[in-house]
Amino acid sequence: MAAPRVTLDTDMPRSVAVTYDYLCPFARNAHEAVVAALRDGSDLEVRFVPFSLEQAHVEEGQPPVWETPVEQLRRGVRALSYGLAVRDEFPESFFDFHLAAFAARHDHGQKFETDVLDDVVASVGLDVEAVRKVVETGRPLEALAAEHTEAVDRWSVFGVPTFIDGDEAVFIRFMERGRVDDLERALDLLGWNRLNEFKRTTIPR
């Protein structure tokens, strides 16, 4: 007896959330594709969700990274705090900041000290003092705490980038940067929950 033909539902979701941490090159690959798709006119609604890899490696019983005073933040958390300040208070500049922050780390090898992030802010035409004031309010850290915690508690997120569609959450590694076609193919598969893991045994060089 022939096996039943498998037909995939290739209707892409119309609304997704996607996690990020500026420290991760694979998050960069995915987010460049997401931003490119949106700038090309995609009607996909995207919620950009911060997820701290530094928090994910905090030992049990230790205080969470967002409880550190603003001036003593770990570098990755500091970058997320700046990104959230821009996302929530200067949304028209978020895409530019988002891509520039990834570039600062992964093209130029910069560590996310305050002066580096100030330069990223200035490079996208934002007022450095205005963004810094938002960071200093602590609101971005509150947003990070809430959104990271929800990602872990509700969807069991463990890394970036994770794409979330309804109750489904899938960790995806794109090997190339900014490929909208790769993004579309991955989004097509989000709802196919009978495929749980599909991992290559070697990394293409």
Please report, for each region that a protein language model flagged, where it lies by residue.
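Solvent-exposed beta-strand sheet faces enriched in polar/charged residues
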Residues: 17-19, 49, 164
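Charge-dense, low-complexity intrinsically disordered segments
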Residues: 21, 69, 73, 134, ...
